[in-house]
A protein has these predicted regions:
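Small-residue hinge/turn detector
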Residues: 94-105
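Glycosyltransferase-associated regions of secretory-pathway enzymes
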Residues: 1-93, 109-221
Length: 221
């Protein structure tokens, strides 16, 4: 199971530590957190606690050149429109998760999640969700795909083709949804099941509606 810290920080926030702890405690999977920073600050309290308490959690750093090499995204992260984008961290996260799972296979999850059950039996699954104004679509916050799954190659090619750097979500969930429909030649996402990819209902990975999300940074006490 893989998590990504793409902001450039070398430590975990308490909320991120909770995501790792819940994943490590609820699942039989080995949990890996990958940082884009040059080093990991093991003296930070949250990071240190995770390493001491959870033996099935490992921390790594990664070089972008190695992550994107031999994929359609190899030149992507060097483009001017990517380097100058106001949403660089978001776009890096969207791209890196796809390249990583393409290369190694496995389960990916965002760092703002809580794992409440064993994920080790889930294979080739993507969760659906609903977004105001766009209806039902697939989300890229939690998914499992096999190593070198051809769908992931199509997603990466789509990223390169549509990227402008001007829209926050242009290579995120809606692109993933289009890629799945094109790859399996279906209009109804429920029809994908017979093709070896299981689309899970929103209650599986995204039970909370976006309207009830709480953003602590905006709270005034």
């Amino acid at each position: 199971m893989f998590f990504l810290e793409t902001s450039g920080r070398s430590w975990l926030t308490p909320r991120e530590a909770c995501a790792l702890e819940s994943a490590a405690a609820s699942s039989n999977l080995k949990v890996n957190i990958i940082f884009l920073s040059d080093f990991v600050d093991l003296y930070d309290n949250s990071t240190c606690s995770i390493m001491k308490l959870l033996p099935n959690v490992s921390l790594f750093t990664i070089k972008l050149k190695n992550a994107f090499e031999d994929t359609p995204l190899y030149r992507f992260y060097q483009r001017d429109d990517f380097r100058n984008s106001s949403f660089k961290a978001v776009h890096m996260s969207d791209a890196l998760r796809i390249a990583l799972i393409f290369k190694v296979g496995g389960f990916y999850s965002d760092l703002d999640t809580m794992t409440l059950g064993d994920l080790s039996r889930l294979e080739n699954v993507i969760g659906s969700t609903r977004m105001r104004g766009s209806g039902s679509h697939l989300a890229n916050g939690a998914f499992h795909l096999d190593r070198r799954h051809p769908l992931l190659w199509r997603v990466m090619r789509g990223m390169v083709e549509v990227y402008t750097g001007r829209e926050r979500g242009e290579i995120g969930p809606l692109l993933l949804t289009r890629a799945v429909r094109q790859h399996f030649n279906v209009s109804d996402l429920k029809s994908v099941r017979r093709e070896g990819l299981h689309v899970l209902p929103s209650t599986a990975f995204y039970p909370a509606k976006s309207e009830v999300y709480i953003y602590p940074i905006n709270l005034s006490l």
